[in-house]
Design a protein with these regions (language model features):
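C-terminal segments of large proteins
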Residues: 1-142
Length: 142
């Protein structure tokens, strides 16, 4: 049993008159070019940990909208977010016990049937502490 638990969900974000609305994406959801996708990663940690790396892989049809790598602060947690071609990496010097939610937007750029990658997390100095999310397929039409 690992102290790390990951859950990854994709949401379709649509703008309405009352503001943005997000709806969960599943295997039956039909996406189209230009859609805005919100990635939500929920991380549960049952003990304090140091030097942890989380890698969120994405489908070839998705492009990140914020491409600048930077240090971020959120809910008392400091981490470095590094956006790359096929994945977004999160580096934690210190990861306190608790539950954390990370979100970032993606844009749909290609049609087809894709496997959206999994999210993995691992302690850099104690690799036996590792976990991963499940993958999901996405279908993109016109």
């Amino acid at each position: 049993e690992t102290p790390l638990k990951l859950q990854k969900k994709l949401f379709l974000q649509e703008n309405t008159k009352t503001g943005p609305v997000i709806t969960p994406i599943d295997n039956k959801t039909k996406l189209k070019l230009g859609d805005l996708i919100k990635v939500r990663i929920e991380l549960r940690v049952d003990r304090d940990m140091e030097f942890v790396h989380m890698k969120d892989m994405r489908a070839a049809s998705f492009e990140p909208t914020n491409v600048i790598s930077r240090y971020k602060w959120q809910d008392g947690l400091g981490y470095y977010e590094s956006t790359r071609d096929a994945a977004t990496n999160f580096f934690f010097d210190f990861l306190p016990k608790g539950t954390y939610v990370f979100e970032y937007p993606l844009r749909v750029t290609h049609k087809g049937n894709y496997s959206n990658g999994i999210t993995t997390i691992q302690s850099m100095y104690a690799p036996e502490f590792t976990s991963h999310s499940e993958g999901v397929r996405v279908k993109i039409g016109e």
